[in-house]
């Protein structure tokens, strides 16, 4: 029977490895919270976002606050040609890359009848295809950097479904499937990949929903409130660190007890 190694090191290692991390959707919300959480333990960060001004401003704040290298890049992940040049610029800005955190996304309320070939393709490109393209672009970097990891944001809507946002829900389900599919091959590179599925988090994407349905979601959540972006940031930081060295191909649900709640 295996026994505990009395010489095992239980010193917290949230800052290990110390390699750079690329964070999509890094100008706001969960992506920005993840950037702060990682920078706080000494990891350089590159914030990729369609909002160029927001990415640059957030990177400047992070660099000044934590004393790490930080860069803000304008990247439209719906364009497959944007990934390679952004990867080159990122390496030049923050050095060795040992992680990807994929948070970029939109949730367009279309219902079934509002789905078009154009918005369907755009949604899948942003949420799913870009994760694959970034993994391809940085695969050699990750393979060369011990302890490398990827975290991709999914959603509880991948499990529950949501009739108002079918593109988003389908894309987030695909993210989990892609994470599980890539985990096997990436393990051979020494690279871990996991998905995080948030519940109702107080981010800019939820502002309109909160205003339209005050108290609606809080009643359904065991903890009785929306989550804060920084609560997700801490979970992402854990998964990106050596603390989670035996986790890959997993979905981590962070929803305040929403999925398991029987409340109406």
What are these regions (language model features)?
Residues 115, 161-169, 181, 209, ...:
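Active-site loop-to-helix junction immediately N-terminal to the catalytic Tyr of the SDR YXXXK motif
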Residues 111-112, 116-124, 217:
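Substrate-binding pocket helix/loop in short-chain dehydrogenase/reductase
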Residues 140, 184-188, 245:
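Alpha-helical segment proximal to the catalytic Tyr-Lys
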């Amino acid at each position: 029977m295996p026994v505990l190694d009395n010489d095992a090191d239980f010193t917290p290692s949230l800052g290990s490895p110390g390699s750079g991390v690329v964070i999509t959707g890094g100008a706001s919300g969960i992506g920005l919270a993840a950037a702060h959480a990682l920078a706080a333990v000494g990891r350089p960060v590159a914030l990729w976002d369609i909002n160029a001004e927001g990415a640059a401003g957030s990177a400047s704040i992070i660099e000044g606050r934590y004393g790490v290298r930080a860069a803000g890049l304008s990247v439209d992940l719906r364009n497959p040609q944007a990934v390679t040049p952004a990867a080159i610029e990122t390496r030049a800005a923050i050095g060795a890359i040992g992680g990807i955190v994929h948070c970029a996304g939109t949730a367009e309320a279309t219902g079934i009848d509002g789905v078009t070939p154009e918005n369907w393709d755009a949604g899948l490109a942003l949420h799913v295809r870009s994760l694959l393209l970034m993994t391809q672009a940085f695969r050699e970097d990750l393979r060369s950097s011990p302890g490398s990891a990827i975290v991709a944001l999914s959603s509880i809507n991948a499990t529950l479904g949501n009739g108002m946002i079918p593109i988003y829900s389908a894309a987030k389900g695909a993210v989990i499937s892609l994470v599980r599919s890539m985990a096997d091959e990436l393990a051979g590179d020494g690279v871990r990949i996991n998905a995080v599925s948030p519940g109702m988090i107080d981010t800019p994407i939820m502002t309109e929903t909160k205003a339209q349905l005050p108290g609606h979601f809080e009643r359904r959540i065991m903890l009785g409130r929306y989550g804060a972006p920084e609560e997700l940031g801490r979970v992402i930081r854990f998964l990106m660190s050596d603390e989670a060295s035996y986790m890959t191909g997993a979905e981590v649900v962070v929803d305040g007890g929403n999925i398991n709640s029987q409340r109406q």
